[in-house]
Amino acid sequence: MEGREQLGGYKWLTFILLLIFVLFLARFGPGGRTGEEAWGRENKGVPKESTFEQKEAPRELINTYDGFRITVPPGWEAEILPGVATILTRPGVAKLSIFVQPLEKITAEEYILYSNRSLQEGWATIKVWDSKKLNLKGYPTWIWEWTRDKVAPGDLNYYREYHLLVSRTVYTFLFKTDAENLQEATRSLSYILQSWEPLPSTGKPAFPEPQRLEREIYIEGAYHKLIIPKGKTLWGILNPHKLGKLEYFHRLIPLEEKLNHKFEFLITYAAFDTRFDLRELQKIYEDGRILMVALQPWWYGKKNDTSLIDLLKGKYDDILREWARQFKMIGDPVFVRFGNEMNGDWSTWSAWFYGKDTDIFKMAWDYVYRIFKEEGATNVIFVFNPHDRSFPNFKWNHYLLYYPGDQTVDWIGLTGYNNGTSYPADLWREFDTIYEPLYKEYMYYFKDKPFIITEFASNEIGGDKAKWIKRAMESLVANYPNIKIAVWFNQIDGKWLYNLDSSPASFQAFAEGLKKEAYQFRAVWPRN
């Protein structure tokens, strides 16, 4: 009897110890606080009192432009992009981006659901672990938690997001970390959210008038050199052609004869399924011309193609290296605009497809840049090229958040079209209406880089295209001296009649404009 009672006591002790062990595993072990399942259920989205040890003093940050104050935890770095975002980073541990979004004509739900379309669809390997609505600090709050595939060491692929509605403004806190730093990072996030307080906003500051910058372009290649003197602008063209094979000349030469002008700068596009004919590329340079290629990271026409994830995993290295080797063999300058118009949701490399994380685009840019350098394609000139209007026009989609940095960008591309009124949402915009504010803003952020209008045009419908062209060609050289190259998009695009011969008057206006002294010069010369 005594032995049975003793044995029973041991059983109870064993049971209690086992229960404690199971509870420990559930909280800290695999699948616990550092696992994906825990990301979906830990804290249930409500910030708790932070208990991390403070080895240095926290500091207050006030963003008067967007209107809020927070306390920055020890060890975190802070950057304010006025009117765009406040970015807090703990290097190697976590990143928090704060966006203050006025709602204007939409509801908070519309803003959140459209912004989070990729989460709902599961694009880009995204897995949503939790989403809910609750009340936080007295404000309606929407919370989302998700993960995606890790694409490289140090990649922060665990996300938590808070949207707090204050009157007609949503404060979005987009936070990311990784499994290894989840506990520490979420404590810091809780600390920041506890400290947050909305304030009156002063709005985005006005950009100063740019100083007039006269720049000469001199780029030497193996066989040719590109020279654009001060006070001159080089005209380029996108003319109908077959991608990959190009076959530019049979349509281009007759156009040049009618205009009495040789276009020394041509552009084309490429997707992952594009294979260039090297000989065709070389013919362009042998004829005294320079080429710009828009390398677009998708499979042409594939809907909802989120190939940046596979690109960063190395799946397309062979294609990228083949492009790099071909461009290297050309020897002369090749302009490359990787992932152009990334701030438009018509581009599947936009952050709209990737949980609003613009860092994925920047990682892809750096990845491609590194491969080209490894292949010795030092003649390639990298062009960073947003669209002039972000869509959706939300703070998280601002072009500055996509900028990979001065070290990997050579030129800045501008793109803005006069869409005319072919579609109900279209608006007739004059050249200066498009480019004056854009030029002023870009000169503030990128004044050390030369500019290129990578593609633009005017529609025929909705106004006087001939007068539009005349005013544009007068203003371009008079008011935008840092724009050294301008490329006309000479094609019909849906209902948009961008082609130069959309009317005899438009064609004649362009031909007359090319006669201006600023456009009459030779830019491509033999090296010797």
Q: Model regions: which residues?
A:
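Substrate-binding cleft of extracellular glycoside hydrolase catalytic domains
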Residues: 278-380
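Substrate-binding cleft of secreted/luminal carbohydrate-active enzymes
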Residues: 206-242, 449-528
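Glycoside hydrolase catalytic-domain groove-lining segments
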Residues: 279-296, 411-462
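N-terminal carbohydrate-binding/catalytic regions of secreted carbohydrate-active enzymes
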Residues: 235-326, 475-483, 491-494, 507
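Aromatic- and acid-rich polysaccharide-binding/catalytic face
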Residues: 263-269, 399-430, 458, 489-491
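Aromatic-lined carbohydrate-recognition surfaces of secreted/lumenal glycan-active proteins
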Residues: 369-397, 448-461, 485-491
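Signature of long, low-cysteine stretches enriched in small and polar/charged residues
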Residues: 120-165
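N-terminal targeting sequences that direct proteins away from the cytosol to non-cytosolic compartments
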Residues: 2-94, 166-167, 176-209
